A protein has these predicted regions:
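Short, linear, compositionally biased motifs with a strong N-terminal bias
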Residues: 13-14
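Sequence context surrounding c-type heme c attachment/ligation sites in exported
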Residues: 23, 27-157
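Cleavable N-terminal signal peptides
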Residues: 9-10, 20
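Bacterial N-terminal signal peptides that target proteins for export
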Residues: 1-9
């Protein structure tokens, strides 16, 4: 029931955010998008530190909070922040979104769903507190992120 309530809340947030951001200019969409991914990266670094790099520091509650934060971003309706023209422009910094993102919507859908599924699985696994399972699922989330980056993100210069 708790998961179902969170799912309904996520769907409502996605609907509201889609409507709210539909009229924002491209740079604002890029800024919001970059903020969401920076927040995700910060939470991933907390999990990596406690599960991969320094498992002796594992704190179940902190890892659960980080995993839930990542899942919240994945369920937040980020697609609304990829409006036409957002492959160019500057948010906090110049976007690295490739123009192919808008040309390959079937592939975009696959990577977006993968990110969503793996983030939600990570939150579920984290709640159980098994560090080995968390590490494995964290790796699966990393693969989902890498898949999108490899296809749709301009490499750092």
């Amino acid at each position: 029931v708790k998961f179902k309530s969170k799912f309904v809340l996520a769907v409502l947030c996605a609907a509201v955010s889609s409507a709210a951001f539909a009229g924002k200019d491209e740079d604002q969409q890029i800024k919001f998008r970059q903020s969401a991914y920076s927040f995700t990266a910060w939470n991933c670094s907390k999990i990596k530190s406690q599960v991969v790099d320094h498992p002796e520091t594992f704190n179940k509650e902190q890892v659960i909070a980080a995993a839930n934060s990542i899942a919240a971003v994945a369920n937040s309706g980020l697609g609304a922040l990829y409006g036409p023209g957002t492959d160019q422009g500057t948010g906090w910094k110049k976007t690295r979104l490739k123009p192919e993102f808008f040309e390959k919507q079937d592939e975009v859908k696959k990577v977006a769903l993968s990110f969503n599924e793996e983030a939600n699985k990570l939150a579920k696994v984290a709640a159980n507190g098994d560090i080995g399972e968390i590490k494995t699922q964290f790796g699966e989330l990393g693969k989902a992120c890498k898949s999108c980056h490899d296809k749709f993100r301009i490499k750092d210069e």
